[in-house]
A protein has these predicted regions:
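Internal nucleotide-binding/catalytic subdomain
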Residues: 1-71
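Gly/Ser/Thr-rich active-site loops/lids in small-molecule metabolic enzymes
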Residues: 12-24, 68-88, 125-141, 183-185
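Generic structural signal for well-ordered, non-membrane alpha-helical segments
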Residues: 16, 20, 24, 28, ...
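Short alpha-helical interface elements
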Residues: 31, 52, 56, 60, ...
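Structural beta-strand/beta-sheet cores of well-ordered domains, especially the beta-sheet scaffolds
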Residues: 43-48, 55-62, 73, 82, ...
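Glycine-rich phosphate/pyrophosphate-binding beta-alpha loops
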Residues: 63-75, 116-118, 147-149
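Peripheral (often C-terminal) accessory segments that flank ATP-dependent C-N-forming ligase machineries
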Residues: 88-201
Length: 201
């Protein structure tokens, strides 16, 4: 079934430097140039949803926002000031900024979802264990389909939380993320158990 994304992990060994250069040259730069030719210059975050196939890179979609859940592990690794970056983008002065600083460690994000997602699901379930999950070393819990009702965090959507962790390796980041996932409970909570496995084989 088609979901909004159930996990993410950067950097991935599945994408080489050559592949990144090719994506920039064949997808991103032509897109920006075409927008300018159409007199629709773009300032902001342009997220390209791509699929790597045997025939090369295929564009699935563009979004004028960060990807979800791709943003969560990227923000865990970003050491530069995000506000400075966004303001420089809006003011068209990106070239004035120094190179971005990144934590060299990989990050893994695991999306916790409501039972039934991506089909029909129920909401309003109390979420427990958030403090315990946040206490896991190098882990953070990003909220998506949640709300605060009478002092209790409850589910309000299909994709509920993005549990994300840094690690010394992809395997270690996965271990930390799933350690935090195991702390969190609500009726019908589920997640994939194989996020980042393709990068470890």
């Amino acid at each position: 079934p088609n979901t909004g994304g159930m996990g993410a992990y950067p950097p991935t060994p599945l994408v080489t430097e050559d592949m990144l250069r090719s994506i920039e040259a064949k997808v991103l730069v032509p897109t920006v140039h075409q927008l300018k030719r159409m007199r629709r210059p773009f300032k902001g975050v342009l997220y390209a949803g791509l699929m790597i196939t045997k025939q090369g890179v295929k564009v699935l979609e563009y979004n004028a926002r960060f990807g979800d859940p791709e943003c969560q592990p990227l923000m865990m690794r970003l050491q530069s000031d995000l506000l400075d970056l966004l303001e420089a983008t809006a003011d068209e002065r990106l070239e004035e900024l120094p190179d971005l600083l990144w934590d060299p460690r990989p990050a893994v994000c695991v999306v916790m979802a409501s039972e039934g997602y991506p089909g029909s699901y129920t909401t309003g379930h109390a979420i427990r264990g958030l403090a315990e999950a946040a206490a896991v070393a190098e882990a953070k819990v990003f909220h998506a389909g949640t709300a605060l009702r009478d002092g209790q965090v409850i589910t309000t959507g299909g994709r509920v939380l993005g549990v994300t962790a840094l690690g010394s390796s992809i395997a270690n980041a996965k271990l930390q993320a799933y350690t935090a996932v195991k702390c969190i409970r609500w009726e019908g909570a589920w997640c994939r158990t194989d996020i980042s496995d393709k990068a470890q084989h």
